[in-house]
């Protein structure tokens, strides 16, 4: 069957992550994957399997999630972006869609992913419009966080920054970019919002949120930047920091060769 590749944006607040979660004798939890599968199945008249590039956690957002699904020949002429956006909840949007070779795989063919984590630095208030999308941290030592981030660049065993729950052959990953950019969303003179960007060939379970939690501890001067290599070398999650909240994280883009 023809394979449809599509790019998704969604607000993850109301969803229990990407992956379908079925529970015995209990209602199915709402997820991005299950919502997409139900809508597409209603259009083509039979069950489908949607595969996503990244299994975002509950509450995590996306601007550039990529997925694929196999479509019957009889539905080839549909404008899938329009059809899906007409049926999906308003907090899930199809940004782009196209047909690809049936060998394409949204998850297995991905070579890098880019995530963004938004921090709000004004300790006095958080704008209500931003509250669902930022972690309100108050003032932070951004220069110390910059220094700490340099120790995380490159290829490392990131098991100290992985939460339990996934069995993997390797916990070695390569971070090619880790940097921050200011945002002047509400002020022309002073920025209260900082976005951290994380680009790597792959991420372990909640790895981005764990790195963000660690960098915030550095920013609060509770950990020295120079301690980062020792945390990595310990290969023990207990030596790291608490996991940052899910709602500050957004999957920005998935890269393919």
UniProtKB/Swiss-Prot annotation:
Cystine pairs: none
Any GO BP: tRNA pseudouridine synthesis
Catalytic activity: uridine(38/39/40) in tRNA = pseudouridine(38/39/40) in tRNA
GO MF term list: RNA binding; tRNA pseudouridine(38-40) synthase activity
Catalytic residues (UniProt): 57
Pfam families in UniProt: PseudoU_synth_1 (PF01416)
Keyword Isomerase: yes
EC number: 5.4.99.12
Protein's UniProt keywords contain RNA-binding: no
Record-listed substrate binding positions: 115
Annotated coiled-coil segments of the chain: none
Keywords: Isomerase, tRNA processing
Enzyme class: isomerase
Similarity remark: Belongs to the tRNA pseudouridine synthase TruA family.
Function according to Swiss-Prot or TrEMBL: Formation of pseudouridine at positions 38, 39 and 40 in the anticodon stem and loop of transfer RNAs.
Record's subunit section: Homodimer.
Protein name according to UniProt: tRNA pseudouridine synthase A
Naturally occurring in which organism (per UniProt): Lawsonia intracellularis (strain PHE/MN1-00)
């Amino acid at each position: 069957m023809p394979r449809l590749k599509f790019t998704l944006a969604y607000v993850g607040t109301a969803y229990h992550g990407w992956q379908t979660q079925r529970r015995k004798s209990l209602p199915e939890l709402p997820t991005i994957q299950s919502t997409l599968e139900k809508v597409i199945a209603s259009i083509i008249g039979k069950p489908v399997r949607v595969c996503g590039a990244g299994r975002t956690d509950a509450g995590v957002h996306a601007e550039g999630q990529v997925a694929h699904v196999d479509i019957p020949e009889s539905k080839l002429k549909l404008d899938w972006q329009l059809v899906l956006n007409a049926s999906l909840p308003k907090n899930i949007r199809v940004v782009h869609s196209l047909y690809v070779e049936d060998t394409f795989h949204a998850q297995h063919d991905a070579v890098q992913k880019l995530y963004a984590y938004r921090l709000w630095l004004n300790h006095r208030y958080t704008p209500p419009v931003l509250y669902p999308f930022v972690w309100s941290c108050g003032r932070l030592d951004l220069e110390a966080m910059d220094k700490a981030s340099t120790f995380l660049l490159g290829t490392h065993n990131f098991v100290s920054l992985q939460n339990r729950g996934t069995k993997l052959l390797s916990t070695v990953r390569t971070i090619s970019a880790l940097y921050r950019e200011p945002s002047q969303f509400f002020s022309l003179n002073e920025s209260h919002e900082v976005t951290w960007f994380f680009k790597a060939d792959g991420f372990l379970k909640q790895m981005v949120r764990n790195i963000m939690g660690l960098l915030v501890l550095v920013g609060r001067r509770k950990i020295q930047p120079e301690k980062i290599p020792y945390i990595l070398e310990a290969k023990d999650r207990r030596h790291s920091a608490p996991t940052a909240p899910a709602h500050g994280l957004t999957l920005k883009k998935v890269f393919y060769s």
